[in-house]
A protein has these predicted regions:
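Helix-loop-helix hairpins in multi-pass membrane proteins, especially solute transporters
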Residues: 15-148, 166, 345
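Structural signature of transmembrane alpha-helices in multi-pass secondary transporters
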Residues: 2, 6, 33, 56-57, ...
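Glycine/proline-centered helix-kink
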Residues: 65, 86, 91-103, 157, ...
Length: 378
């Protein structure tokens, strides 16, 4: 429910960001996320928790939809790469620390504290946003919000994510096929409507820019490859070579740690090296690490796994900062929100596709699914 809420709301909220200002959308997102976190913790039924998670997803989507647009607004053009690098660093830290912090909370308290911890953090973030975020950007030429486009967007991407999730969870093939067919039909009319809009909610105007569309495609592929590895490897580590859950978590940690190191460095290097060259180098290093993982010996040592995981994370970090920089900077300034929303959508589509592919490969190849997934990711 949380992920679907995010993916259906990213583009409409980024459109509103271009229309009314990124600062306003970001602050609203913080307020909604904080309040709904409290409601999640106080939920007394699964239905109430599900509804609260949907609302929380809308708040999270507001934050994601204008995040990189705000970075572009805050940083001077010559230092935009550093801003993207810092943002990628924060994402990597969250990915590395989140599961560990969640496990620590659950070992000491009830599940409600997974949501309650967001409340003080959210309140602090709201005050910081009010104090430090720059004023709303000047209004763009967008004069109205097209509700039919938002509904068609929600149905198209909602059905796509639901179909991918259902496929990964082994739902009826007929149900998944029906969802895909419905998605294609609605998506066709959605795209046709966007092509007639002066400022489209689905940024087809930006997708006509070759470097923008190429960067979006590579972003989807990179997150798909990441999920192919990060979802399939735990099965291999625990089922095939018998590592414990704690050991598995530690062996996966070099990936985000290496990303934490490389992402800000890549952001700095953008000022000196062409972003396309940095991104290509990052993808090459990541691919080498993934192929190395696919060729693991039958009884690998911890070091065998660690030295292969590290280049995966390093390459991922070296790619993300310049690629995100290219996506945002290639869009006109008044369409930064659309570029930011498309970047978040690409990430979620890549992650969902990767998880669905892992399920398919394990159904087809059994225990050797990890090997196939890593080869495909590379």
């Amino acid at each position: 429910a949380y992920q679907i809420a995010i993916v259906i709301a990213l583009l409409p909220l980024s459109f509103l960001g271009d229309m009314v200002g990124y600062r306003r959308i970001y602050k609203i997102g913080l307020v909604v996320f904080t309040i709904t976190s409290l409601i999640c913790a106080l939920s007394r039924s699964l239905e109430m928790l599900t509804l609260a998670r949907v609302a929380q997803g809308l708040g999270g989507a507001a934050l994601m939809s204008v995040n990189t647009a705000l970075i572009r607004l805050i940083y001077p053009k010559r230092q935009l790469g550093r801003g993207m690098g810092i943002n990628s660093f924060v994402v990597a830290v969250s990915s590395a620390a989140g599961p560990t912090i969640a496990a620590a909370i659950l070992s000491l308290a009830s599940w409600q504290w997974l949501f309650l911890i967001n409340v003080p953090l959210g309140i602090i973030s709201i005050f910081l946003a009010m104090r430090f975020l720059p004023p709303n950007s000047a209004a763009s030429k967008i004069t109205r919000f097209d509700l039919p486009s938002a509904i068609m967007n929600a149905l198209t991407f909602g059905l796509l994510i639901t179909a991918l999730g259902g496929f990964a969870q082994g739902q009826s093939g007929y149900l998944v096929l029906a969802e895909v067919i419905a998605m294609l039909i609605i998506g066709f009319f959605f795209v046709r409507r966007q092509l007639r809009m002066p400022v489209p909610l689905l940024p087809v105007d930006l997708l006509r820019i070759p470097i923008f569309s190429l960067s979006i495609c590579t972003s989807i592929c990179s997150f798909c490859a990441q999920m192919l590895a990060m979802v399939s490897l735990p099965f291999f580590l625990q089922t095939v070579i018998g590592r414990s859950e704690v050991e598995t978590g530690l062996l996966l940690t070099p990936w985000p740690l290496a990303t934490m190191v490389m992402a800000p460095l890549a952001g700095y290097l953008i000022e000196k090296v062409h972003a396309g060259l940095l991104g290509a180098m990052g993808l090459l290093i990541m691919a080498c690490g993934l192929f190395g993982l696919a060729l693991l010996p039958s009884s690998p040592s911890d070091l065998d796994i660690i030295w292969r995981m590290a280049p995966c994370g390093a390459g991922f970090g070296l790619f993300q900062s310049p690629n995100n920089h290219t996506i945002v900077s290639s869009a006109p300034a008044h369409r930064s929100g659309g570029a930011s929303g498309m970047l978040g959508t690409a990430r979620l589509l890549g992650q969902s596709s990767g998880a669905a592919l892992v399920a398919l490969l394990f159904n087809l190849a059994g225990d050797s699914g990890t090997h196939t997934a890593l080869l495909l990711a590379g």
